[in-house]
Design a protein with these regions (language model features):
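Buried hydrophobic packing segments
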Residues: 22, 26, 210, 304-312, ...
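Glycine-rich phosphate/pyrophosphate-binding loop and the adjoining helix
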Residues: 140-141, 146-192, 196-200, 318, ...
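Short glycine-rich or small-residue beta-strand-to-loop segments that form or flank ligand, phosphate
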Residues: 5-14, 72-77, 190-196, 306-313
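N-terminal glycine-rich phosphate/adenylate-binding segment common to multiple enzyme folds
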Residues: 49-161, 249
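N-terminal beta-loop-helix "entrance" segment that forms/cooperates
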Residues: 34-58, 234
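Glycine-rich phosphate/nucleotide-binding loop
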Residues: 50, 234-336
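Glycine-rich phosphate/diphosphate-binding loop of Rossmann-like nucleotide-binding domains
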Residues: 7-24, 29-30, 155-228
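Buried hydrophobic positions in well-ordered alpha/beta secondary-structure cores of metabolic enzymes
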Residues: 12-15, 69, 136, 178, ...
């Protein structure tokens, strides 16, 4: 079987602790399914690298990782040492833009053994699988542009501007991906996040493109909500949603809120995709570097492991993806008595949980 080369970037904080468990599980499932994975480790995109070199990435970073089949990423950021906008714009956001990873995909599913903080209207707890949505976020333009600036800094006339950029190509390709995904799922339901009653130029354009794209997908039920009430609906009735698509900013907000509604953001995965595969796609947990718990060996590795499963799926190994998801669900099932990390009311270490999932795969 052809070798798949994976660029491994652990990054900062707990990224360095959860990444070994992600690789442990990837190696276990690769061994079971006869998949040839080569993991190449890189130390950049971290505070340690910045401290030594004065920049987040080497000048030839694209040459070093651009030929890989995928990037397996941990976390970046250490605000006490380096401002977030420096670490993010100097690494992760560069990966997304230079490698045209225009789809950010984040599933949010209520897993066994996890208590959702949002109950049903009658006060009863939600059951595993009752919340099962995917947030599709535009990942390369929108509100997160570098167009803008500061004038008259430090004076009473100080002005700060940052422009939102929406192109037809950029909007249409993320909407097409979202509609295709919705059409492939049982509910066939797509929700668009907007704010066209207040953001009177870019958001009406977004709405127009959604309406136009919907004509090509008559089997998909489409609705839209303004972002403020949409966040309320996420909390009140998360089971209503299936595929949710949003701009860079709105998708960013919703793709943290969605997993939070399922009980713990620590298990949430994400994929930054270049669907045409002209460049490597990047797979990372939703949680950040969490400096407050770094070094204590208590970080939950499931987000890293689940992101690895998404990577396997994108590389064409659907059965391996399913095996990893099944192992996660089995370990989280209360009857399994498996070791759990403190965020899930356990006292196990990061490696205890990673080993338990790897063992489950090997059964």
């Amino acid at each position: 079987m052809n070798k798949k080369r994976i660029a491994v970037i652990a990054g900062d904080g707990i990224g360095k602790e959860v990444m070994p468990e992600g690789i442990r599980v990837m190696e276990a499932v690769a061994d079971k399914f006869g998949i040839n994975l080569q993991f190449d480790h890189f130390d950049f995109s971290s505070w340690d690298y910045f401290e030594k070199h004065g920049q987040m990435l080497p000048d030839n970073w694209k040459d070093q990782i651009g030929g890989h089949d995928a990037i397996y990423f941990g976390a970046v950021g250490w605000p006490e040492k380096i401002p977030d906008h420096v670490s993010l714009w100097g690494s992760l956001l560069l990966f997304r833009r230079e490698f045209d990873q225009y789809i950010n995909l984040r599933p949010a599913r209520l897993m066994p053994g996890i208590i959702a903080p949002v109950v049903r209207r009658d006060g009863t707890p939600r059951q595993p699988g009752e919340i099962d949505m995917v947030i599709v976020r535009e990942n390369t333009e929108g509100e997160y542009s570098s167009i803008g600036g500061r004038m008259y800094a430090g004076t009473a006339r100080e002005i700060v501007m940052q422009e939102t950029v929406m192109s037809r190509v950029g909007v249409d390709r993320v909407l097409k991906f979202a509609f295709e995904l919705a059409q492939s799922r049982p509910k066939k339901h797509l929700t668009s996040a907007t704010k066209s009653n207040g953001i009177a130029i870019t958001m009406p354009y977004w709405d127009e493109r959604v309406a136009e794209m919907a004509k090509a997908y008559p089997a998909v039920q489409v609705d839209k909500f303004h972002i403020d009430i949409l966040t309320a609906h996420f909390v009140q009735r998360p089971d209503f949603f299936d595929v949710v698509v949003g701009s860079n900013l709105f998708g960013d907000i919703l793709s943290d809120l969605g997993p939070a509604c399922t009980g713990t953001i620590a298990i949430a995965p994400s994929a930054n995709l270049n669907p045409e595969r002209h460049f490597p796609s990047l797979f990372e947990p939703v949680h950040g570097s969490a400096p407050d718990i770094a070094g204590r060996a208590i970080a939950n590795p499931i987000g890293q492991i689940w992101s690895g499963a998404m990577m396997l799926d994108f590389l064409g190994f659907r059965a391996a993806h399913n095996a990893v998801l099944s192992a996660i669900e089995q370990v989280l099932t209360p009857a399994s008595d498996a070791p759990l990390t403190p965020d899930m009311a356990g006292n196990a270490s990061t490696s205890d949980l990673g080993r338990a999932i790897a063992r489950q795969i090997q059964l």
